[in-house]
Amino acid sequence: GSKSESNRLLLLKQLFPSLEIENISPSKDTDMMSRGLHLLGEEINVGDAGTAMRFLTAYYACCTDRKVVLTGSERMQQRPIGILVEALRQLGASIDYLSTEGFPPLSITGKHIEGGELTIKANVSSQYLSALLLVGSTFPKGLTLHLEGEITSLPYLRMTLALLNQLGIEAVLEDNLITVYHTPEVEAQTIVVEPDWSSASYFYSMIALSEVGSSLFLNHYKKESLQGDRILADIYQSFGVKTIFWRDKIQLIKERDDFSTIFSYNLMDCPDIAQTIAVTCFGLGVECFLSG
């Protein structure tokens, strides 16, 4: 399953235990996220898992019965987290730096957070914003984020909001304003995590480089996907690959080999598929211009 969806749903399940999750990602990052949510000791080490560091910072900041030290690998301790910490502090969180200001490790004393409004730059990591939004639904006053500037990584923000909505939590994005409303509980339900579309890119490339008429099926992919990399289905039409969406799977077919010898695309919303597209273009002899 998708690592991005899995990490968000694991945090939501911790907040709303009636939620059940199937097809969770087997990735190391997701395993670290799961361990970090369930460890009972005072120190939690997430290794190199950046998403876990950010999501767990927000989660433990509002766990009133816990005091933890959140740390990671040497590399993780060089990755900034100050923007998220400052945002949580403005909401009333108690978080201290144990070494370098603005970087892990963190000492977090969980507190009751009422919620309210925050102003934050729109071009920060979408994981900072998602961390705040995921826990914001439990705040008595909810959470409203005023985003300054142009929003980057919009697909990941939309994924977070869509998952909240799927659980029955009202979360709305209007221009540069995001509001998540207080939701004390959600109905019992099971969510099946969709596979990573970035992983599907290798199969798209394989079909694009195959003979006309070549075909394969990939299970559990959805037409109405939450993932930005779903744009693969549109992009690979440029390389003669047609995508047919069935009820619980997709079919890739190499329909033609009469395509343009020049391909240009802005991958700002889907950077993870850039390398695969570049390799596809090289194999087909297509001149490639990718930006983002």
Locate predicted features.
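Short, structured segments at the rim of ligand-binding sites
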Residues: 1-292
